[in-house]
Amino acid sequence: MPLRLIKKKRLCRFNPASFLTTGDQIAGTSDWPKLNMTANPEASKHTEKANMAVPHHVAITMDGNGRWAESRGLDVSEGHHAGFENLQRIVADFANRGVAYLTLFAFSTENWDRPESEVNGILELAIAVIAHEAEQLNENGVRIKHLGRVDRLSPELREELELAVKKTENNTGLTLAIAFDYGGRAEIMNAAKELIAEGTPLEEIDESKFAEHLYTADMPDVDLLIRTGGDFRISNFLLWQTAYSELYFSEIMWPDFYGEHVDLAFESFNERKRRFGKRI
């Protein structure tokens, strides 16, 4: 029976137990596989495949859930369900590849303007997934972070996020940052406001000091930014942290972005010459 998580009228049916799919539904897994606990915090790790370097910090704009569903004659909510299932695949895959930080753009500050039924469905689904998955992520050594505002989240979602962050704060495996009610411009503006409120002398403000007031204060800059779904834009995501990121855009919709599509993204990353503004 679907779990009732929000007292108001339900707008999205979801059984959280179904998120832990079988090996037939998610290729090669049954529940959560044992994740790699040895992500190198100092440098990129190399995979066995062609001695491929793995980016230290990967950020993903998970786009295309709605179009994936519509192309199959399904309700948009089913696309979001499929997208969350792929999240499980990707987290396990990236951890096992040696990625140290994975940031997922789950819900933007602008997404509140979508139809109310879709927004409520996403919020309810997020509550169910976080509530049901946090323990297994914790057992696998994953550290969960939340990037974004909390004041507009429902009490249920805020509580689940805070519990997940607290439960996993001392883990040393993959850091999974969930950008929910996140906007890059708002993040930068809030950092500036905090510095002003603290009375920080102007001469003490530099890039390092400013970065301490971002949501990602204890995280490195993004090495590889992936966007699925066929659009070629950043969409207000990690504007500060992607200053020198490599960008990879895929036409594949998010629910189908795994396996060989991840291989292609990492292969593309390995073909880049990262100069960081210098002449090499």
Residue ranges and their predicted role:
Residues 2-5, 19-20, 31-280:
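Flexible, compositionally biased loop and terminal segments
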Residues 8-9, 26:
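Polybasic, lysine-rich low-complexity intrinsically disordered segments
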